[in-house]
Every structure is written in structure tokens, then in C-alpha cells.
Amino acid sequence: MRYDNVKPCPFCGCPSVTVKAISGYYRAKCNGCESRTGYGGSEKEALERWNKRTTGNNNGGVHV
């Protein structure tokens, strides 16, 4: 399925994202490098997590 208003992957820049449901939980995954979010309770929550970006952390990395 194609999703509107989804940010490209922060790691590889791929614009293609898939949401997968496993046992009633959902996660978003990059179709390029396969980075993914943690699980959420809905497809909408998984996409919101995907689009949420932080400016950094103690390790200097980017969280999805």
C-alpha cells in the first residue's frame, strides 16, 4: 500500500515505506535499508512513529 505524507527514510532516503501487522501490532519499515520503528497499536501510530524524528541522542544517532 502507498502512504501519503510519509517522510523518506532518515538513513537511506528511500521514500517507500511498508506497514506490517504482527499479532495486532504494527510497525513501519523502510523498503530500502529495512530500518523500522517499534511496534504500535495501530497502522496510524506506526506511521506517526515513522514520521517522528529526533535531533539526536547521547550516542549522536538518529531514532525512528
Swiss-Prot record:
Phenotype on disruption: The single ralR and double ralR-ralA mutant have increased sensitivity to the antibiotic fosfomycin.
Task: Give the E.C. number(s).
Answer: 3.1.-.-
* Resulting phenotype, K52E: No longer inhibits growth, has no DNase activity
Q: What class of enzyme is it?
A: hydrolase
A molecular function annotated in GO for this UniProt entry is: double-stranded DNA endonuclease activity
UniProt keyword annotation of Nuclease present: yes
Any one of the GO BP annotations: response to antibiotic
Q: Which Pfam families match?
A: Lar_restr_allev
Tell me if Glycosyltransferase is a UniProt keyword of this record: no
Q: Which UniProt keywords apply?
A: Antibiotic resistance, Calcium, Endonuclease, Hydrolase, Magnesium, Nuclease, Restriction system, Toxin-antitoxin system
Required co-factor? Ca(2+); Mg(2+)
Description of what induces expression: The sRNA antitoxin RalA probably works by inhibiting translation of the RalR mRNA. The ability of RalA to block the toxicity of RalR relies on a 16-nt sequence which is complementary to a section of the RalR coding region; in the presence of RalA sRNA decreased amounts of RalR protein accumulate with no significant changes in the level of RalR RNA.
Reported regulation of activity: Inhibited by EDTA.
Question: What does it do?
Answer: Toxic component of a type I toxin-antitoxin (TA) system. Upon overexpression inhibits growth and reduces colony-forming units in both the presence and absence of the Rac prophage, cells become filamentous. Has deoxyribonuclease activity (probably endonucleolytic), does not digest RNA. Its toxic effects are neutralized by sRNA antitoxin RalA, which is encoded in trans on the opposite DNA strand. Has RAL-like activity.
Q: What else is known?
A: This protein is encoded on the Rac prophage.
Name assigned to this protein: Endodeoxyribonuclease toxin RalR
Q: What gene, per UniProt, encodes this protein?
A: ralR
